């Protein structure tokens, strides 16, 4: 009836460190602003005519950007051969830069999509 278990001490310690070192240091608002800045930088470099970003007003934006891609699975597979992971979900390619990504990294993603937006590497 009762099962012995232990507390996930290591997970609690990891969460505490993450909250202290990241969220307390930078603040959630600053992290979110950096993510949106990187998204905008990515969109400035995205030029493939078949890729259409699903855009929302600033009030309704999130850290996830959805791109319409005619060959969704092929596009995701082509990106994965370049160690760029974007997941196909709900008919869109999910692009989600993190606050620690660099401008160069999102430019690399945009360049790869510009080359392979049709699903070809």
Question: Where are the model-predicted features located?
Answer:
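Pyridoxal 5′-phosphate
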Residues: 1-121
């Amino acid at each position: 009836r009762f099962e012995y278990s232990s507390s996930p001490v290591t997970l609690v310690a990891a969460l505490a460190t993450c909250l202290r070192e990241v969220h307390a240091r930078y603040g959630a608002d600053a992290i979110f602003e950096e993510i949106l800045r990187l998204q905008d930088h990515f969109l400035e470099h995205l030029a493939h005519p078949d890729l259409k970003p699903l855009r929302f007003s600033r009030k309704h934006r999130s850290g996830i950007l959805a791109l319409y891609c005619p060959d969704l699975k092929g596009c995701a597979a082509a990106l994965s051969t370049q160690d760029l992971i974007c997941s196909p979900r709900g008919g869109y390619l999910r692009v989600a830069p993190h606050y620690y990504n660099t401008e160069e990294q999102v430019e690399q993603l945009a360049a790869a999509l510009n080359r392979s937006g049709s699903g070809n590497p």
